[in-house]
Amino acid sequence: MSPVQQAVVERVERLTWERIAPRASQYDAAGANPVDSWRDLWADGFLAGAIPRAYGGLGLDMATYIAVIRAIARGCASTAMTVHMHSTVMRFIDAVGTAEQKRHYFDEVVRHGKLFGSWGSEPAVSLSRTLLMETVIRRDPSGYVIDGVKHFCTMALGASYYMVWCALEGGTDMAKALQLALVPADAPGIATDGKWDTLGMRATFSPSVTFTGVRAAADGLLGDPGAAIQVGVIESFALGYAAVYLGIAESALAFALDYAKKRVVKPENIAVAADPTVQRHIGELAAQLDAAALVLADSAARWDGADLTELGPLANRAKYLTTEVGLHVTSKVIQVVGGRGAYKEFPAERAFRDLRTCTLMPPTVDRMLEAIGKSALGLDTAMFNVSGRRASRP
């Protein structure tokens, strides 16, 4: 990293440890949106990390952005994930939005600290299998109307705008019918069931939401139909997930290292760190995390200059490795620490819960391995199967 990039990462690391990490357990217990942490990140410019400098944002390159998300995740996984989802919406606006949409929505973030959610998941569809939307957007004389149900609606009741993934009425080929719509959170007809009592990632607050006759202005439609899967942004969801996974696992290992150095056992009166068995476990975990970190950093460094067909493989390999390594590390840390690792006053159990939960986000391990294998064989590099056709690229 250049000195400028490193300074950005160090700034968010300080903010994370001073302000964000101390709140993580409270937001986790409450299952509530981390609004104070969002406010702090906005004040320091990080809600505008993916917004171009011309619009007042930080304009971070992908390598720096991924390092920022990873750093936040070490302190609070839910805060990191919500900021990543919001930032990806900013990338969609930058990629397919009109000049007026960019001016208006970027200003909402830069000047007013507004957050944007991205809602694509649906109850009857597995995005790891097929990219298909059953939520319908239809035109009427006064604009557009949205009807449907969305699952895992991250930042519900917290974000100011929701980017809703819809299908044009009557459309089944998502390459032609997929339509993104930016909807204000206070639009009439939006109802949440309020249910989000999960194993982990509790502060992402992601209940189900029903849209009943929700009106969307014509200037709220983002991009042409099908554009969302043609501009190289959808793949960046998975790259950011990988950064969150790695940050969570790193926080778990950091706790184990601190514990092993400080915990003294009798009758030898020596630190746990002196035990060769513990040393071997720590060595295994450290080596695995280093390997996953290198792959993630390489994918991020290559991202901005990559061809669209390269983005899926870059994201898949990073997400796959950080998933497998992260799950192993967060489980093994509790084994190394022992009973204290199960106490909620310590961060290991939250890391275990958060990692196990957020690694369920698509694409799944099996789908990633399939895609990585096809790429290695010179076959299809698509990250998602698009309903209505087998796309050569997402």
Regions found by a protein language model. Name each.
Residues 235-238, 271-285, 311-321, 349-357:
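Alpha-helical scaffold segments that form or flank carboxylate-/histidine-based iron centers
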Residues 35-43, 47-154:
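Glycine-rich flavin
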Residues 151-156, 237-241, 358-361:
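Glycine-rich phosphate/pyrophosphate-binding beta-alpha loops
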Residues 21-29, 290-321, 334-342:
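C-terminal helix-coil-helix/basic helical segment that borders enzyme active sites and/or dimer interfaces
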Residues 339-394:
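Glycine-rich phosphate/cofactor-binding loops in nucleotide/flavin-utilizing enzymes
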Residues 149-191:
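A short core secondary-structure module
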